[in-house]
Amino acid sequence: MTTVAVNAPLPPPLVELCNRRPIPTPRIISLQRQLISTPVVKNYQADVQEAINDFKRLNITPGHLGEVIDTMGQQGKLLPEIIEADDDFKVNQTRNLSCKTVEYLNFLENDKLFRCRLCYTHADWLWCDFHRNHAYRGTRDITCNNYVEHLNSDMGVVMLIEEYFYCLSSCNFKQDAKRALQTLTKFESLSDLMASYNFSTPDLDTNAYELMDFE
């Protein structure tokens, strides 16, 4: 086991559903909002490809996690509790992940966030460019438009899987790993999730390293 000394505070609460607006509003994305969002999507696609290339350079073996998560998105099985509480119907009930996101998650299954093990810690100056540019660090409240846009993006899915591995590897927050995965899928472990789609993956929920505290 590789031990990495780093203070690993828990990210902000995964779901904050208070103060929801009582009156539903149509799910409409304005042209202006599309124009603002498009460059971010393009940058994400380019940056996630760089991350994929890094996995390949490290000879990481891809799994099938991305394919399973993509299937769940098409079946409307992602973010079930958030969608149930979304009175305004702003969060996408079904989704199709991009091919690059699927490939990234396939590699992440076996990398377990080791390549980016210092991302999601308080030491944001040690974060990689991909997570510095695309990880959401704002208010987690579905009345916040930025948070809804994040949840509807591929990165909204990626972050919850990465937070699962982050908490799993932390000496202080292992118990919170289940919470991250349940927010995305209702499953408490990735092995149970994968088994439900006929994939047997040994040691999937065993951390390959442990993050230790430091000041």
Swiss-Prot record:
GO terms for cellular component: host cell nucleus. Its main location: host cell. The keyword GTP-binding does not apply. Keywords: Host nucleus. It is found in: Host nucleus. The keyword Cell inner membrane does not apply. Plays a role in the translocation of the P40 subunit of host Arp2/3 to the nucleus. The robust nuclear accumulation of Arp2/3 induces nuclear actin polymerization to assist in virus replication. Mechanistically, subverts the host CRM1-dependent nuclear export pathway leading to Arp2/3 acumulation in the host nucleus. Interacts with host proteins P40, P34 ands P20. This is Protein Ac34. It comes from Autographa californica nuclear polyhedrosis virus (AcMNPV).
